[in-house]
Amino acid sequence: MTQEKNHKEYLFIREAFIRFLNEIENSQQAWEIMEDIITLRTSFLIDRILDGMHMDFDKALDLLKKHNSFTTEREKRERDILIAAIDNLVDFAAAEEFAMLNELAATEENLSEERQENICEKYNLHYATIENNDVLYAAGIASWWIDQSDESMITYMTQGDERVREWHLSLEGITYPKRDFPSELIPPIEFGCRCYLMTDSTISKVIASIPLIEDMEINPVFSESLATGGRIFSEAHGYFTEKFRNEPHLQDIIIRIKHKLWKQ
């Protein structure tokens, strides 16, 4: 079902991408279509956030409209997660499509439509499938994190199978109080990470575990965590280039999309 969903979403983007190619000589029209593509990609990523948090769209909108009128502390934390996720993922979607545009521009002239579509597919199906899963997983972990008390002991665990990366396995069993748990170790800590956290009532592992973090080479893309109000994909991600940050059309698109989401 997940693969089918990813493919259906790609087909929506592909349709818009073909329109983009047909209007590429018309700069204004092409940018308008690019905004449609970025909006689609953003909506698909936000959908993963809602799925991971077990939240429907109406509840998400209701939370976003609230400011200080929360019924529970959980509602406030859920809203904080939604805001952090949306802020990060609008940027991410725009940066991803800009990376696609740059690859198109870097290829030889008169590239066939099939090869152009292959580039679109690489970003919006193959890469997107992995990214969608990471976003879904980050949201699920964030939702679980909300329910843990600050005093609870959190232990890092792997799936324990042959697919586990060695350096992930080296982290298994590391335990901290929630209040001290490093954001860098809240899954996902890398693309395609399947590690998870569990509560542990014992404190015996903690003293031995805490010094380890200082010597670890953590993937900088995942140095923050949605669970603690950070970004899923940090500024270290290859999409977030200086060229992207300085492209005025893209920054205007980002502002408009965020405004629409907050206004809802």
Where are these regions (language model features)?
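Conserved short secondary-structure elements within globular domains
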Residues: 128-192, 196-203
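N-terminal leader/targeting and assembly helices and adjacent pre-domain segments
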Residues: 1-119, 201-264
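Active-site acidic/histidine clusters and adjacent loop/turn architecture
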Residues: 91-154
